[in-house]
């Protein structure tokens, strides 16, 4: 899911667990649009593909299962993560609304 209003990119906690990615606690927390707070853990990714795009190694926030489930229910499909403004900016994201396509460099 592309969320241009999200400052950061998040991965689904269940996906992170399934891929056996180690997580690290932080002192930060975040909240959803209803004010539900969740601790902000991070996972270091080294080899992740988004379609044909190879995402460079970096640390990404982990979205708690509760918040991820809410987003999936609203979207009526499973959400594996949110692409936020941080990734869209650093990877020069272009959103083509006519073809509903996302291009990353």
Predicted regions and their residues:
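Pepsin/retropepsin-fold aspartyl endopeptidases
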Residues: 1-105
């Amino acid at each position: 899911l592309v969320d241009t209003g999200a400052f950061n990119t998040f991965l689904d906690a269940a996906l992170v667990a399934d891929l056996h990615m180690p997580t690290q606690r932080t002192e930060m927390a975040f909240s959803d649009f209803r004010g539900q707070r969740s601790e902000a853990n991070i996972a270091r990714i080294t080899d992740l593909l988004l379609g044909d795009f190879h995402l460079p190694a970096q640390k990404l926030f982990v979205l708690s299962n509760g918040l991820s489930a809410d987003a999936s229910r609203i979207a009526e499909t499973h959400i594996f993560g949110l692409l936020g403004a941080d990734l869209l900016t650093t990877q020069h994201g272009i959103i083509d609304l006519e073809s509903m396509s996302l291009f990353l460099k």
